[in-house]
Amino acid sequence: MAELDDQFETTDSGASTTYPMQCSALRKNGFVMLKSRPCKIVEMSTSKTGKHGHAKVHMVGIDIFSNKKYEDICPSTHNMDVPNVKREDLQLIAISDDSFLTLMTESGDLREDLKVPEGELGEQLRLDFDSGKDLLCTVLKACGEECVIAIKTNTALDK
């Protein structure tokens, strides 16, 4: 009998990109969806219960992909959506002419679907890579979006 070598591509499980959490349970430096964008909470304050209802929670968050500031106020008993945020360090292999990164996962698979980040981080990444440093790129994934948010020198190499 011939040996079967089936190759299955991994796909999204179809799980929700967010989960509900009561507003009063959210914390500073946590994540929350503000104006349908995944944000990191940078400021939170609670107002007292008024004569017409619930205590209110005022939140200020920074979009984890665009760094835009968003604000929202909601009753402390209401549920807010919290994004499922996944963080992964990938080894930088190459940078293409059209600014796409070639990254290697821990399992050895190559990814070529992420662009060099805009601004200072992108410039630093190019400088360090061109000077021959072995780099790890920290990739943040939430709500179907991904981007490189940080770089660091790979110290785990066998010398």
Swiss-Prot record:
Lys-51 undergoes hypusination, a unique post-translational modification that consists in the addition of a butylamino group from spermidine to lysine side chain, leading to the formation of the unusual amino acid hypusine. eIF-5As are the only known proteins to undergo this modification, which is essential for their function. The keyword Protein biosynthesis applies. Pfam families: eIF-5a (PF01287), IF5A-like_N (PF21485). One of its GO terms (biological process) is translational elongation. CDD domains: S1_eIF5A. GO terms for molecular function: ribosome binding; RNA binding; translation elongation factor activity. GO terms for cellular component: cytoplasm. Keywords: Cytoplasm, Elongation factor, Hypusine, Protein biosynthesis, RNA-binding. Belongs to the eIF-5A family. This is Eukaryotic translation initiation factor 5A. It comes from the Eukaryota. It comes from Drosophila melanogaster. Disruption phenotype: Severe larval growth defect. It is found in: Cytoplasm. Translation factor that promotes translation elongation and termination, particularly upon ribosome stalling at specific amino acid sequence contexts. Binds between the exit (E) and peptidyl (P) site of the ribosome and promotes rescue of stalled ribosome: specifically required for efficient translation of polyproline-containing peptides as well as other motifs that stall the ribosome. Acts as a ribosome quality control (RQC) cofactor by joining the RQC complex to facilitate peptidyl transfer during CAT tailing step. Functions as a regulator of autophagy. The keyword Hydrolase does not apply. The modification Hypusine is found at residue 51.
